[in-house]
Amino acid sequence: MAAMMNNERSSSNKLQVDAENPAAVGDELDLAARANWLRAAVLGANDGLVSTASLMLGVGAVKAEARAMVISGFAGLLAGACSMAIGEFVSVCSQRDVELAQLERDGKRGGEEEKALPSPAQAAAASAMAFSVGAVVPLLAAGFIVNYRLRIAVVVAVASVALAAFGCVGAVLGRAAVARSSARVVLGGWAAMGITFGLMRLFKASGI
């Protein structure tokens, strides 16, 4: 009972402090918004890394030339960045329309709430940039290695290190277990790369 009373007193004091210091509340909300943006950027970079590395390994399973792998990776970077940007733009536009309609009903159009709404163009640019940052990692890893086996190994190794780093950052931002989150991201990336490489090897072996 005493613990409950202490908790209630603590909550009451916190509310009183927040009410007396609205700037602190605004700072907390701003930090939370920034953390969400950063976490979305990490996820976008992870998508770019996994999809591009898997695409390059899939092409590498059929063709041993470095040029073919690099060109396929660059094409994947461009296509993925455009797809992410367009998808994010459409998604944020839809969200913005809904929130503007709500502000219209509340009679708050033109106020601070409207100015605080997310920008579709900024969201699209950020999404494309994040994807590109992740996608360029395997491209740089494979672009300067002539030996086929070494190139494949380096792409997998560099992608694994980057995946672990992305998983670590995502865990810190989401306040989750770092080791478990990083392992989950790395294992997921390995699964995507392994399945793509293996299926393309079977495709090559079938002679189709």
Swiss-Prot record:
Signal peptide: none annotated. It comes from the Eukaryota. Keywords: Ion transport, Iron, Iron transport, Membrane, Transmembrane, Transmembrane helix, Transport, Vacuole. It is found in: Vacuole membrane. GO terms for molecular function: iron ion transmembrane transporter activity; manganese ion transmembrane transporter activity. GO terms for biological process: intracellular manganese ion homeostasis. One of its GO terms (cellular component) is membrane. Residues 1-41, 91-125, 173-184 are cytoplasmic. The chain crosses the membrane at residues 42-62, 70-90, 126-146, 152-172, 185-205. It catalyses: Fe(2+)(in) = Fe(2+)(out). It is a multi-pass membrane protein. Residues 63-69, 147-151, 206-208 are vacuolar. InterPro entries: Ccc1_fam. Belongs to the CCC1 family. PANTHER family: FE(2+)/MN(2+) TRANSPORTER PCL1. Probable vacuolar iron transporter that may be involved in the regulation of iron distribution throughout the plant. This is Vacuolar iron transporter homolog 5.
